């Protein structure tokens, strides 16, 4: 990971990076994110770049070096442009809608699923079979999308379920009829 770690993170316009104690705080038009740092890495702001350096050349230090560089890069991208994941509902009668602050899913069960999203995440339903999840925290956007997908993951025989927008479902052949 050190090849990634040695690249500086460029700070886009409108984004502010602060270093406090053992935390990196990135704020921008889409919000504020903070990341606690491990002792293996040090972070410095050099003009319009954030530079991540490691203390020594041990394997854990090299791993943390690349990891924290990518985490800070994702924070800068998140507060400036944000992240979006899109889900599709495939199946007869599968639909989603938003009621108040809850996402209501009808996924072929005998009951509807009510999902309360975190305050930092924006969930939109442009069509009854499409869900768009957006926010500034890449990890949280991915977690919410994975949680919604876990209610009815796509099955390999007919492809029904909740899937990511460009996800390819490996299909299986059904039972072959005997004589």
Swiss-Prot record:
GO terms for cellular component: cytosolic large ribosomal subunit. The keyword RNA-binding applies. InterPro entries: Ribosomal_uL6-like (IPR000702), Ribosomal_uL6-like_a/b-dom_sf (IPR036789), Ribosomal_uL6_a/b-dom (IPR020040), Ribosomal_uL6_bac-type (IPR019906). SUPFAM superfamilies: Ribosomal protein L6. This is Large ribosomal subunit protein uL6. GO terms for biological process: cytoplasmic translation. GO terms for molecular function: rRNA binding; structural constituent of ribosome. This protein binds to the 23S rRNA, and is important in its secondary structure. It is located near the subunit interface in the base of the L7/L12 stalk, and near the tRNA binding site of the peptidyltransferase center. Keywords: Ribonucleoprotein, Ribosomal protein, RNA-binding, rRNA-binding. Pfam families: Ribosomal_L6. It comes from Chloroherpeton thalassium (strain ATCC 35110 / GB-78). It comes from the Bacteria. Part of the 50S ribosomal subunit. Belongs to the universal ribosomal protein uL6 family.
């Amino acid at each position: 990971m050190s090849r990634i770690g040695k690249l500086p993170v460029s700070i886009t316009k409108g984004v502010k990076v602060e270093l406090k104690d053992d935390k990196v705080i990135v704020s921008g038009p889409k919000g504020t994110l903070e990341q606690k740092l491990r002792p293996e890495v040090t972070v410095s702001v050099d003009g319009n770049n954030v530079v991540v350096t490691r203390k020594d050349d041990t394997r854990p230090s090299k791993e943390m070096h690349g990891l924290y560089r990518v985490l800070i890069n994702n924070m800068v991208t998140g507060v400036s442009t944000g992240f979006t994941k899109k889900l599709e509902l495939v199946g007869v009668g599968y639909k989603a809608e938003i009621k108040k602050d809850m996402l209501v899913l009808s996924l072929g069960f005998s009951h509807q699923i009510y999902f309360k999203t975190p305050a930092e995440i924006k969930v939109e339903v442009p069509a009854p079979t499409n869900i768009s999840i957006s926010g500034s925290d890449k990890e949280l956007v991915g977690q919410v999308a994975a949680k919604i997908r876990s209610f009815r993951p796509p099955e390999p025989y007919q492809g029904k379920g909740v899937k990511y927008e460009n996800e390819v479902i490996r299909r299986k052949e059904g039972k072959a009829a005997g004589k």
